[in-house]
Swiss-Prot record:
This is Parapolybia-mastoparan. GO terms for cellular component: extracellular region; membrane; other organism cell membrane. The keyword Flavoprotein does not apply. GO terms for molecular function: toxin activity. Its main location: secreted. Expressed by the venom gland.
């Protein structure tokens, strides 16, 4: 699991 990628995706979703 990539935290950096997850954070970027979450920020884009919001």
């Amino acid at each position: 699991i990539n935290w950096k990628k997850m954070a970027a995706t979450a920020l884009k979703m919001i």
